[in-house]
């Protein structure tokens, strides 16, 4: 059977570690990259957005663990089982080179974190460099 990973995950720019699901959409406009991440139940204080070395957008969520109360009989504990006792996630996305990492904005509304990464539209010198070829003849 062929490796279906290429077809299921065509963008190898994504890294994910989670005890819960943090679904993500990545859209691109003429002037920015827009990321929308599902973070239901998280407050802005529970979420950390960082730009790491190498233009990597890091989004981490750490939910509050519920305390076990004495004198309670648990009949179903799906939220605990699927989240490992707390809701945590980490998503890393390798950003393109032409972005303004110092102007990234993020906000949470109705359980969705939106991160806007502006593009750098200024013309830059080419990273292509000619190399002289010599002969030993």
From Swiss-Prot:
Keywords: Peroxisome, Stress response. Induction: By heat shock and methyl viologen (paraquat). Residues 15-134 form the sHSP domain. It comes from the Eukaryota. One of its GO terms (cellular component) is peroxisomal matrix. GO terms for biological process: cellular response to hypoxia; protein folding; response to heat; response to reactive oxygen species. It is found in: Peroxisome. It holds the Pfam family HSP20. The keyword Nucleotide-binding does not apply. Its main location: other. A motif (Microbody targeting signal) lies at residues 135-137. Possesses chaperone activity. Belongs to the small heat shock protein (HSP20) family. May form oligomeric structures. This is 15.7 kDa heat shock protein, peroxisomal. It comes from Arabidopsis thaliana (Mouse-ear cress). The gene is HSP15.7.
